Regions:
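Non-catalytic terminal and connector segments of soluble metabolic enzymes
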Residues: 1-189
Length: 189
């Protein structure tokens, strides 16, 4: 496609689209349905610990979503996946824990509301808490530091600066389920 914002341009040949609405319903049920219950939540991990990775808008626009997803899927089970386009109120609520803590807070909110981004919920394949492992995959929040200390990390590869650092990931083990619930339960309801 000649459109730089088309799915093919953004995701390359690693993108599948259901043929019609009925096929989309079958595909969604196959990949995400919780057997025996209908909670309205896309994920079906139950009580397993989860963590959140966001492919930030600038990384989406640069066409990195598929590359990030490949690396995430190489280490974790992807239990939910959704595109979001947040308004300021929801972005402010999500990043509230950083207000007054990081000088980049306002710029982080602006980046998150600038255009669509991809939210990825992950679980550890061995059943452990995936937060630390995902943080290691993402690397330090500052891509310059990431390139020195963790050259293969997502932020080293796809980040530009502290705000446009490629990805957001859950910081604390106790926050993984809360961040995932915010996107995949609250915002999806």
């Amino acid at each position: 496609s000649s459109n730089p914002k088309s799915l093919e341009a953004v995701f390359g040949v690693r993108c599948y689209g259901s043929a019609d609405a009925a096929a989309a319903a079958r595909d969604r049920a196959f990949f995400f349905a919780a057997e025996g219950r209908n909670t309205g939540r896309v994920s079906s991990v139950g009580d397993r610990p989860t963590s959140l990775c966001l492919v930030k808008p600038h990384a989406m626009a640069a066409g990195y979503a598929g590359l990030v997803l490949d690396q995430v899927m190489g280490k974790f089970h992807v239990t939910a996946l959704e595109m979001f386009n947040l308004d300021r109120a929801n972005a402010t609520e999500f990043y509230e824990v950083y207000k007054g803590v990081t000088p980049e807070y306002n710029a982080m909110v602006e980046e998150l509301i600038s255009s669509p981004f991809l939210a990825i919920e992950v679980a550890d394949p061995d059943g452990g808490n995936p937060v630390e492992g995902l943080r290691a995959l993402c690397g330090p929040a500052d891509p310059e530091i990431a390139r020195v200390l963790r050259g293969g990390s997502l932020r080293a590869q796809f980040g530009q600066d502290k705000v446009k650092n490629g990805v957001h990931c859950t910081d604390l083990p106790e926050d993984g389920s809360l961040e995932c619930e915010f996107f995949f339960s609250i915002l999806c309801s």
